[in-house]
Amino acid sequence: MIPLRQNIASMKGYIPGYQPPDIASWIKLNTNENPYPPSPEVVKAILEELGPDGAALRIYPSASSQKLREVAGELYGFDPSWIIMANGSDEVLNNLIRAFAAEGEEIGYVHPSYSYYGTLAEVQGARVRTFGLTGDFRIAGFPERYEGKVFFLTTPNAPLGPSFPLEYIDELARRCAGMLVLDETYAEFAESNALELVRRHENVVVTRTLSKSYSLAGMRIGLAIARPEVIAALDKIRDHYNLDRLAQAACVAALRDQAYLSECCRRIRETREWFTTELRSIGYDVIPSQGNYLFATPPDRDGKRVYDGLYARKVLVRHFSDPLLAHGMRISIGTREEMEQTLAALKEIG
């Protein structure tokens, strides 16, 4: 018998969105990827780093990602000591649990949101407590003083779409005895963010990713912004060469090209609003979204039926079997052409 830890043997593990092998033949709207390529400056930086013969790849990358921390600090208005780079924001989420929640201690998060928080907690042997949402998009039953070691809040919420108001998040930070982690994966698509709370509260951490708005999901680049003492703790336990040379070069170029980022986000927001209106015109219930996706429910509330119909037409969206979500689908925002084709497919399915 293989001597697995009991918590590992009994856990289910996280199931990511499906990546079809023949991806070019699909309209892929299931994992909130950006429909536009990364900045041309990113491609240029990667080629320059690679060089004519790839010799640079034989040398380890910067272990500290110091240049990235400096560029991110300039962009967000923080000293580099407040920033840590990561192999996708998932690495930071994992290390936050490792740093702050011992076996048997509690972490919490909103359900529905990113269920991977629970998976990471299970690996650590931490206890998981989930909280629902009220009709006015507040956390149901959240205590006046939450004693869990880490509480994760995805804002904008995924898969639903709305953001939590800044003043409400500020209140949550005061009510959390442990760390409040604001997962701002989709912040660049939203009207506001909560970065200012990092300065206001010593227990607030904001995580960001370059996977969505910067079109770099294939390179796995993330970061966290927090007080220097929190960053120093995370730095102790991260993988020491966690970002490869090409990813570091790409990240610097992407963060510096804010004009390109702004234009991509503008186009996605514009398409999101158009698609919201079109879905409602055919009877769908659509939650107003601040992300690059919509959660939409068909008139008969049978999300699986519509998902299957789209799948048969090679349009891939995300359906969740969770009873709280099974009535609808999360649909990533693609190009205008992709969304027009998706709308036509939905009208065919009925």
From Swiss-Prot:
Q: Name a single GO biological process.
A: L-histidine biosynthetic process
According to its UniProt record, the EC number is 2.6.1.9
UniProt pathway annotation: Amino-acid biosynthesis; L-histidine biosynthesis; L-histidine from 5-phospho-alpha-D-ribose 1-diphosphate: step 7/9
- Family statement: Belongs to the class-II pyridoxal-phosphate-dependent aminotransferase family. Histidinol-phosphate aminotransferase subfamily.
What cofactor does its activity depend on?
Answer: pyridoxal 5'-phosphate
Give the keywords, sorted. Answer: Amino-acid biosynthesis, Aminotransferase, Histidine biosynthesis, Pyridoxal phosphate, Transferase
Q: Which GO terms describe its molecular function?
A: histidinol-phosphate transaminase activity; pyridoxal phosphate binding
What is the name of this protein?
Histidinol-phosphate aminotransferase
Tell me which NCBIfam families the record gives: hisC
> Where N6-(pyridoxal phosphate)lysine occurs along the chain?
212
Q: Which domain of life is it from?
A: Bacteria
Q: Which Pfam families match?
A: Aminotran_1_2 (PF00155)
The catalytic activity, as recorded, is: L-histidinol phosphate + 2-oxoglutarate = 3-(imidazol-4-yl)-2-oxopropyl phosphate + L-glutamate
Subunit-structure text: Homodimer.
What is the phylogenetic placement of the source species in the record? Bacteria, Pseudomonadati, Thermodesulfobacteriota, Desulfuromonadia, Geobacterales
